[in-house]
Amino acid sequence: MTSRELYTSSYKKIFGDWGRSSSLLYTTNSSSSTRSQSYRPREAYTSNISSYRKVSRSPGHLSSAQDHFDLSQSTALSNELKIVRTNEKEQLQGLNDRFVTYIEKVHHLEQQNKLLESEVTLLRQKHSEPSRLSHIYEQEIRELRSKLEEQEQDKDQAQLDYEHLGACLEQLKLKLEQESARREEAEDVMKNYRKDLDQATLNRLQLEKKVESLLDEIAFLRKVHEEEIAELQASVQEAQISVEMDVVSKPDLTAALKEIRMQYEVLSARNQQSSEEWYQAKIANVSLEASRNNDSVRQAKEEITEYRRQLQARTLEIDALRSANESLERQLQEAEDRSNEEMSHLQDTIGQLDNALRTTKEEMARHLREYQDLLNVKMALDIEIAAYRKLLEGEETRLTSVGGGSMFGIGYPFSSGSYSGGRSSTTSTISIRKEEKKESPEGGKGGSSGQPKTSKPGDQEKISQKAAAN
C-alpha cells in the first residue's frame, strides 16, 4: 500500500464523504478545483459544530458536567470554550486549506518522482551501453595497436633486409668492378698475346721463307758442289790419263794427284758435313721456335678461352644478381607501399575509434551530469516530501494533543454523528499516520532503487522553514 493510498484513506476517515470528492479533485492538478474544494471543509466544519453542539447539549453530558463543575465555572468554561472553538475553527480552516495544498504537492511530487525514476532507469541503461561499447572499442584499439606494432616490426625487418641487400649489392658492385678490371687486364693481355702471336706468325713465316731459301741455297750448293766434284773428277780423270801417258816420264805426278784428290775429298766432305750440320741446326732452331710459338699460342688461346668462360660466368652472375636486386627492390617497394597503406588505414581507424571514444565519453559525461542533476532534484524533492510529512504529522499531533476529544468533534466529521464515532475515526487516523511514519524510510529506500536518500539536517530545517512560511 503506497503513501498516497494511506493519505487518501486517512483523509476519508477524517473528513468523510467530502474528502472523496476532494481527493478526486486533487488529481486534476488545477487551481480552480483546489479553490472550490477549499470551501467544502468549511461547510462540513459548520455541520460538525452543530452536531457537536447537539451532542454537547445531550442530557448525559450535562449531567456529567454538573457533577464536576459548578455553574460559575461552567459559564466561564463555556465562554472560554467558545473562544477556543472560534480560534480552532479559524486554525482548522487554514490547516484544511494548507492540508489540501500539501496533498496536491505530495501527489505532484510523487508523479515527478516516478518520472525521475523512469528517467534514471533509462539513463542507467544508456550508461551501461556506452561502457560496453567503450570496452569493445578499447579491445579493438588494442588489437589494432598490436597489428600496428607487428607492421612496424615487419617494416623494421624489411628495412634491415633492405640494408643487408644494399650491402650485398655494394659487394657485388665491388666484385663487378674488380671482375671488370680483371677482364680489361685479360683483354690487354690477350691483345698482347695476339700481338705476340702475330709476331710469332710473322717470324714463323720469315723463318719458313728463310728455310726455303736455305734449302734452295743448299740445293744450289749441292748442285754446285756436284758440278765441282764432276769437274774435279773429270779433271782427275784427265789428269790420270795424262799421268798414265806420262807415267814413265813423270812418276811423282800420280802421287801428287792422289794427294790433291784426297785433299779435295776431305774438303768436300768437310764442307758437306758443315753445311748439313748448319742446315740441321737451322732446322732445329726453326722447329724449336715454331714449337715454342705454338705452345705460347696454344697457352694464350687456352687463357683466352678460360677468360672468356669466366667473363661469361661473371656476366651471367651479374645479370642474375641485377635481376635479383631489381626483384628485391620491387618487393621492398611493394612492402613499403603496402605497409604505408596499412599504416594510413590503421591511423584512420584509430582516429575514428578515438573520435567515437571521445564522443562516447562526452555523452557519458553528459548523461552522468544529467543523472547527477536528476539525483539532486530527486533528493531535494524527497527532502521536501519528508518535510511536508513532518509538518502534517506535527499538525496532526498538535491537533490531537491540544483539543482532546472536543477538538475531534469540532474539526472532523463523525461517521455516525456521535462523539464516540469521531473519537474512533481520529484514533484510526492517528494509528495510520504512525504506520506511515514507520514505513516512510523503508518506502523511500525501496523507491529510490539505489539512489541517495540522505540529506543534511540543515537542508531539511531550511526546507521545513520555507514550507512553514508558505
Curated annotation (Swiss-Prot):
SUPFAM superfamilies: Intermediate filament protein, coiled coil region (SSF64593). GO terms for molecular function: structural constituent of cytoskeleton. Pfam families: Filament, Filament_head. Residues 432-442 have a biased composition (Basic and acidic residues). PROSITE patterns: IF_ROD_1, IF_ROD_2. Residues 280-395 are annotated as: Coil 2B. Residues 396-470 are annotated as: Tail. Transmembrane segments: none annotated. Residues 271-279 are annotated as: Linker 2. Residues 1-91 are annotated as: Head. GO terms for biological process: intermediate filament organization. One of its GO terms (cellular component) is intermediate filament. Nervous system; in axons in the PNS and in small perikarya in the dorsal root ganglion. Keywords: Coiled coil, Intermediate filament. This protein contains a central IF rod domain characteristic of IF proteins but displays divergent head and tail domains. This is Low molecular weight neuronal intermediate filament.
